[in-house]
Structure formats: C-alpha cells, structure tokens
Design a protein with these regions (language model features):
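Hydrophobic membrane-insertion alpha-helices, especially the h-region
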Residues: 1-15
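Loop/turn elements at helix/coil->beta-strand transitions in domains of secreted/extracellular proteins
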Residues: 37-39, 62-64, 90-93, 223-230, ...
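Extracytoplasmic/secreted proteins, especially bacterial periplasmic and envelope-associated proteins
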Residues: 52, 77-80, 120, 137-142, ...
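Secreted/periplasmic serine-hydrolase-like ester/acetyl group-modifying domain
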Residues: 113-225, 309-339
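Flexible, glycine-rich surface segments
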Residues: 187-274
C-alpha cells in the first residue's frame, strides 16, 4: 500500500511541476477528449497548431479533429505519438506533418546540435505525456545518452516551487485539461513576404541517412498498423532545396502506397496572400489559417470517409465550443485586417 501511495503521489507531483506551455496545453487537452470521438488527428510541430482549426472544420464539415502538436516536434517521436493516440482514439485518418523530416538534421548553432537531437524539442513531447510503457519506449529509442532525467522529469523541474502556488499548474495535476480550441493557437500579427512558386521543380534531393531511416521506420509502422495516413506539407515560404526534399519524400511515401499532399503546390487555390496572411516565413497568421483550413477540410471530405456529426446530440459541446472560439477569433481577425 505504501509503494502504491508513493507512486501515485510521485506521478501527481511530476505532473504538477511540469511548466504549462503551448505543447503541454495541446497534449493534456488531447488526454481530456472523450474516448473514440476524434475522426482525424494532426501530428507534428507548430505547422499543425497554427494552421489547422479543428473547430472551424467541425462547423463547416461536421467531422471532429485535434492537433496533437508540440513546438519543433522531432521526427523520431511521431510513431510513438501515434501509438499514444491509438490508446484512446480510432481516427479515420492521421495527418502527419513532414516538416520535422525537412528540418530535423539542420544544425542549431545555439545548442551545437542537429535539431532532432536537441533536448528541448524532445522534452516538449516526453515531458507532457502520461507516464506509460509507450513514453518509456519513446525515451529509450529517441534520446541519445543518459535517459534517467527524461524518464523522471521532476528532476528537471523540482526547483520550480512557483508551480506549487500557481492555480494554472494545479489544473494540470492529472495531466488532463480541456483544450477548448482542440490544439489550435492563432498567430495575431502580419509579416509581408515574397513567396516564390517552386511547384515546377521536379528534382529530388535525398534526405540524410538519419532522416531517411526515420521516415522508413514511420512508414513501416503505419503499414503494419494498416492505418490511413496523409503525409502533408503546409504552405510557407518554401525554398527550392526544401521542395527537392519533399519531392524525394513523396516518392518514398508512394512506395508504401500512402497519401501525400504538398499544399505549397496549391497556394493560388488556397488564396494565401503573402502581404496579409503570414505571421513569418514558416507560419500563417489567423487569416491564413482560415484559408488553409477551408482548403484542407474540403480535400479531406473529398478523399476520406469522414462523418458529419453536427446533428448528433452527443457532439453539441463541439457546436458550443465553436461559437465561443469563433467569437474570440473574430476580434483577432478584425485587428489583422486593420494592420
């Protein structure tokens, strides 16, 4: 009995001490969703959570979705995120952000490490998940070097005594906390960009050996799970080099008979305006997210069997959450239109 009580207390304290960040809000919000209620789950980095508006998609098309997304998500954790999601949800389709494979092996001068090995992006996932066998496997297989501090993350945060007196942290003590926007975060400013059309580039640039191996591992996992997956590239200020990498990824994905969509090839159809719809070169603002969600929502409805739940009484909560969310978003839209 003592061991059980100590274990429960240890886990709850670990959850309490974890800082409440965007990544934490998203993952704990996912845990708060009712079992088997999500039709689509979008996995990846910030390219997910500032682009896809789950509640807007529900209002317009009727299917439910969630952004299981963390800042700078590294590619090696994606299969474990899928495994975590499948514990409680049975989505018709997963959307997997391919940017982690594009930026994963880029060198970060601040940390003197390649991106996918950096501590912070890995912790954005591991330090917000429930303690479980899957989390332990993720840490052992995704972290280089000593792993104890990842398994027991309270060691990193125990000195943050402010957590004990912050009401917001107490709301996350069970690692479940409703996320009313379903993992979406609006970018509220504008950066004017010049975006070059690179859709004519058909050359392929092979990924590094590490990224190629991780992509293969993920494709094999999805194949074995017999899970529908759409591998997707969000629209941004893409370079020719990036486009060549995505062309290579498209070929690899096709070898496994899986779906691929590069929304940069549809920038005109989406209607993104470089002078008004971007937050920075890598992300859209709310106005851009509105357009991206409309395009992608229509694409998903055409290509996958997604139900319309708008008249289902079990999902009235989604209708109310949309109204509340959209009210807040309208204020941001007005500000962006004035900029």
């Amino acid at each position: 009995m003592f061991v059980l009580c100590f274990s429960v207390l240890f886990v709850l304290l670990s959850y309490l001490y974890r800082p409440v960040t965007t990544s934490r809000e998203n993952i704990c919000g996912f845990y708060a969703e009712k079992k088997n209620t999500l039709d689509m789950v979008y996995i990846g980095g910030s390219a997910c959570y500032v682009y896809w508006e789950p509640l807007a998609a529900y209002d317009k098309y009727g299917f439910t979705s969630y952004n299981f997304a963390t800042d700078a998500m590294p590619p090696q954790v994606i299969r474990y995120c899928m495994e975590e999601i499948l514990k409680t949800q049975s989505p018709e389709v997963f959307l997997v952000d391919l940017r982690p494979f594009q930026y994963g092996d880029l060198y970060d001068e601040v940390t003197s490490s390649v991106n996918y090995k950096r501590e912070a992006p890995i912790r954005n996932v591991t330090d917000n998940m429930n303690y479980s066998v899957n989390r332990a496997a993720m840490i052992e297989n995704c972290v280089e070097g000593e792993t104890a501090a990842y398994h027991f993350d309270i060691a990193k945060y125990h000195s943050l005594l402010i957590s004990l007196i912050t009401p917001r942290n107490w709301g996350y003590i069970t690692n479940r906390h409703p996320m009313r926007s379903k993992g979406f975060h609006a970018c509220e400013s504008v950066e004017e960009l010049y975006i070059e059309d690179v859709s004519h580039i058909k050359e392929k640039q092979r990924l590094s050996e590490e990224m190629d191996d991780l992509l293969t591992e993920l494709l094999e996992y999805c194949k074995n799970k017999e899970q529908k997956v759409l591998f997707i590239v969000h629209a941004y200020q893409i370079s020719e080099e990036d486009q060549k990498k995505y062309n290579y990824m498209e070929e690899r994905i096709a070898e496994y008979g899986m779906d691929y969509l590069n929304t940069n090839d549809y920038a005109e159809e989406i209607g993104l305006e470089p002078s008004a719809d971007f937050y920075n070169r890598d992300h859209v603002n709310l106005l851009g997210a509105d357009k991206y969600t409309k395009f992608l929502g229509e694409y998903l409805v055409r290509n996958y069997t997604l139900p319309d739940k708008r008249n289902d009484s079990a999902y009235r909560r989604w209708t109310q959450e949309y109204k509340e969310w959209n009210g807040r978003m309208e204020e941001i839209r007005e500000t962006l239109r004035l900029d």
